[in-house]
Amino acid sequence: MKPAKVSLLRRLLHSLKHVDCNIAKRFPSTIKIVKLLMIFMVFTPISSIYAEDVYQNFEELKNNEDPSDYGVVTKETGSPVLVLAIHGGGIEGGTSEVARELSKEYSMYLFEGLKSAGNSVLHITSTHFDEPRALKMTGNHEYVISLHGYAEEDQQIEVGGTDRVRAADLVEKLQHAGFPAVLLNMDHPHAGVSPNNIANKSKTGLSIQIEMSTGFRKSLFGIFSLKSRAVTQNERFYEFTEVMFRFLKNSY
């Protein structure tokens, strides 16, 4: 139980003491319900109620989470392209494994959730993600390929980013290989075109953001679990990453 949550709960419950006594006497059950709702809201992750992040930046996360519950992996290859996966591990499952495969030839930054459960609390949205090593690596590369996952059981790959020409070319290559890819409009929530998005803080500001549905990510592995994904990549996984390798080699 985190001290910050305990303190918040105490303040909320204390505030109920100032409720007019007549109201409390007339509606005792209502007061009890309000107290229960307060407890629920404090101890339920904000993301599950409002689909918002628990932490607004990396400093907040670092100050509240055990260091063993997350990790950062980096690899420099001298390539102009950085493969970026800031929601790896158990946060957006499957993005770590794709990033690691592509890192055989390209630089990589990977932030991973390593909890046995509840990794969604480690999600910091791209426009707020400011882990120092991520900022440094992004700023040292010309281009960024940003890997993400979103909750949808249908198989879909949504491609966005600021590099519209290359993004459209990638969609064409993926479709030709039989993958369910679509090019997002600039105003789509998953387009990833905000200048505050860490993927757009490279030397050129050019990025491709790849959003993979849960259904598609599951199709890449024999067993879709945190511990098993790294050793159960299937033929479809390697077909997908091979398309990515060819695209990267021919485009940059």
UniProtKB/Swiss-Prot annotation:
It is a single-pass membrane protein. GO terms for cellular component: plasma membrane. Keywords: Cell membrane, Membrane, Transmembrane, Transmembrane helix. Disulfide bonds: none annotated. The keyword Cell cycle does not apply. It is found in: Cell membrane. Pfam families: Gamma_PGA_hydro. It comes from the Bacteria. GO terms for molecular function: hydrolase activity. Belongs to the UPF0714 family. This is UPF0714 protein YndL. It comes from Bacillus subtilis (strain 168). The gene is yndL.
